[in-house]
Amino acid sequence: MGCYLMPHPPIIVHEVGRGEERKIQKTIDSLENISQEIKQKRPDTVIVITPHGYVFKDAVSITTLPSLEGDLSQFGAREVKFKFENDLDLAREIMEETKKRNIPIAEVSEELIKKYVLPKKLDHGTIVPLYFVTKHYPDFKLIHMSYGFLPFEKLYEFGVAIKDAINKSDRRVVFIASGDLSHKLTPNSPNGYTPKGEVFDKTLLQLLSEMKVEEVIRMDKDLIEEAAECGFRSVCVMLGVLDGYEVNAKVLSHEGPFGVGYGVAKFDVTGYKSTSLLERFSTIEEDPYVKLAKESLEYYVKYRRPMPVPEGLPEEMYRRKAGVFVTLHKKGELRGCIGTVVPQKKNVAEEIIRNAISAGFEDPRFPPVREEELPEIEYSVDVLMPTQPVKSKDELDPKRYGVIVRKGFRAGLLLPDIEGVDTVEEQLSIALRKAGIRPDEDYTIEKFEVERHEQRVF
């Protein structure tokens, strides 16, 4: 098996570029090099994951049309056209392995295309890499897939599912991760410019050349977003395909004269590893507070009743009484937060069980959590310390203390160390708004500390 990172600028195709493609000659040379190598491997099947196919927010996709065809007519090169037989047996095996792992996958069939009036043509993210491959080796079946906007760890696991399906088959397979790097690489970029574009490209390619897979999957999400790339998620899936293998990685070229980064790299399997990185990515530090919140919500989603308090918890969780807040995040965004300032149950364990359910089902800002969302939910549990009255705002620190503001029966609470809340003024403003108290009213302030338990996903 061979894996490759290949960009897909239509201008690199001579029939589109009409000579302009010579400005990215290094990329052309690298793609020709890869295509010659693929010819030597003589794959039965080529799998392409593309950012420009059937992309869904909450699922990966795989196309199950009997034949896969398309052209570059939208780029003025109708004569550049291809038709491939779909490797449906392997495609269905990939779907089965993906479903076993509870990864949402959309089967793009004739029925789905008709129902949603989707285009029935291969995208340029697939055609451009295959333009080079087919010049040297056209005799293969194709599998066409697209990533979804799932957590990077989940995309990696999708790659593992693909690997498992390949290993069950008798196919010789080449996997192509189609994708461009930053679309804001230079001041002449049509998508705008940010110096972070170059930082992203250099960082990703350096990590890939050293096969620092964990560091790739854990790259700064803000950097990735600001770079305006389209290939990072394809890379995450490809790295999953390589899970468990010894790999010799080599970056062949990188350039971006048109303001978009084009990186070309190859990944040769040289042996086997005794461990899988997937286990690290899916491992949660077993903080008993977080574990109980997770188990509580998952139990309620499945059985629609609160779980009993389990045995084997730390003794303090049976003995201790305190207010508890449970916070849920999904893909880095808040998904629910409900809690109690003073304890309502006989111990912290019961408090967590109840408030985890409330965070998932009773936060009026969000719809109830669905079963298919559970793998993407991250949990934190805040155990509240006793409150203290505040006489001066100088006593406050939004990183250390949460606040409660009160006026009569109205009250608003904000936990400490909330992302984006950096000043006392911001903290109080949000708490007052939650309480429905005007800033010019006479209100009291209390502060409190929390014992925070957070989920750590690697």
From Swiss-Prot:
Gene Ontology MF terms: ferrous iron binding; oxidoreductase activity, acting on single donors with incorporation of molecular oxygen, incorporation of two atoms of oxygen
InterPro entries linked to this entry: AMMECR1, AMMECR1_dom_sf, AMMECR1_domain, AMMECR1_N, AmmeMemoSam_A, Uncharacterised_MJ0810, Xdiol_dOase_suB
Ranges where the record places region Unknown: 1-277
Residues in AMMECR1 domain copies: 284-458
Protein name from the UniProt record: Protein TTE1956
Taxonomy of the source species: Bacteria, Bacillati, Bacillota, Clostridia, Thermoanaerobacterales
